[in-house]
Amino acid sequence: MEVNPPKQEHLLALKVMRLTKPTLFTNIPVTCEEKDLPGDLFNQLMKDDPSTVNGAEILMLGEMLTLPQNFGNIFLGETFSSYISVHNDSNQVVKDILVKADLQTSSQRLNLSASNAAVAELKPDCCIDDVIHHEVKEIGTHILVCAVSYTTQGGEKMYFRKFFKFQVLKPLDVKTKFYNAESDLSSVTDEVFLEAQIQNITTSPMFMEKVSLEPSIMYNVTELNSVNQAGECVSTFGSRGYLQPMDTRQYLYCLKPKKEFAEKAGIIKGVTVIGKLDIVWKTNLGERGRLQTSQLQRMAPGYGDVRLSLEAIPDTVNLEEPFHITCKITNCSSERTMDLVLEMCNTTSIHWCGISGRQLGKLHPSSSLCLALTLLSSVQGLQSVSGLRLTDTFLKRTYEYDDIAQVCVVSAAVEVEA
């Protein structure tokens, strides 16, 4: 009959502790009025409590610091620091001690040890200490693997390891939107506005130290998150840069193609890389975190070979009364002459006046034509001008143009300002 051998005791002990900043001590003040039964008892106890602030005993926040009571949360972008100690609990001298610390993520295994050289010997009651640091760049499960190998006085080689599993959480929720700029009504420019919505999804406030956009080589960027007041730039978020838990901020940036790229329309068309956001924040007692998004990609406006833009349109029109708009149609092709047909499709609120399906004639490469159109609205309120279709008779390709612009439709009894 086989008997399992007893588990061998190791001569060395391994301790691993996470290093984090302390927190301010908080207490729950219990007070009452002097006319109540306890009298001044509670107030006197709070004054005698060393953790309270002298003269402001009823404040929950004290002057003392407390060490972390648990492992806590680790968020993406923060620096994970850990203290590793190997102590010789025996009465023997241990030789050739090698301590190795690896961090296993879902995609890679990283060596965090400061030195891979073995320590010649470790006397009784002595220890080997090491501090490791790692900027966390992945979310999900992480495993810290600490391995220790050594040689006993009898020449026996020993080895053991311990595993410490922890989760890395997401601190911020970042959403981006792109808007194509318009130069009054004449044409759509190559300028792009980026709106970045950043939400704090942790349970503690953050100090937003920096939120910047690092543009790609094709663009120059202008931050639109401050205003000029009396010659001084003031943040649109006020003097306090704190982002409370579950609060959201919106940052705005304007990107404009550099001259050498703006002149080459083919480069800007299609999917273009805009750049990446660089976010730096601080939390408890100045602990810093940093996130960089992946390269933000934006689909350039799908003009195809034909671009339609507005030259003129009224802001306000009367209900059920015709009004006029002027459209500009541009052949974006540099080689091919187009023969276009214009169709006007009514919507539930917008009705086009005129002949649909008319020939516009030949449009040469890189040339434009202006077209006056008449329409009316049967519904009050802010209405979207939609329903224009241009068909290239040679390729049998139709270009659809909806949400071209918006007009405010009011009752005829309301005077329309010029």
Curated annotation (Swiss-Prot):
InterPro entries: TRAPPC13 (IPR010378), TRAPPC13_C (IPR055428), TRAPPC13_M (IPR055429), TRAPPC13_N (IPR055427). It comes from the Eukaryota. Pfam families: TRAPPC13_C, TRAPPC13_M, TRAPPC13_N. GO terms for cellular component: TRAPPIII protein complex. Part of the multisubunit TRAPP (transport protein particle) complex. PANTHER family: TRAFFICKING PROTEIN PARTICLE COMPLEX SUBUNIT 13. Belongs to the TRAPPC13 family. This is Trafficking protein particle complex subunit 13. The gene is Trappc13.
